[in-house]
Amino acid sequence: SCEVEIDSFYDDDNNGAGYYNRSADLCSRTWVSFYRDMDGNYCRQELDFFLDRTGIDYIRVEYPNGAVDQYEYNFRWSWENYAQTSIRMSYGPNDVSYLDDVYIGGNRLSGYLDGRNNFVEFQGKR
């Protein structure tokens, strides 16, 4: 018989002595980014990661006429690799985002969101 074990990504955080467990750092604060969307609207995004592998993605869009839209999305997250440099964020069926080349340090979270042409950087807000 052939048995296949389905790995739970790299979520037990028991990475051995060779790697520093980055989950505590990731979950230690709210991560905030300010940017302009494709239409030039001013946007604020906040990401919260929790140790139970859930998270909240909050986006506020301010329009030139003064109107404001706010969106809140829940997601489940996991580390995609042993070195904890890639985060998988699942918002629902067929709705998954990846943050690659993750850097956490100096009150910053940065990486490439869903592709090499989309570098993002968040500042920590305690």
Show which residues each predicted segment covers.
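Lipid interaction determinants
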Residues: 3-74, 83-126
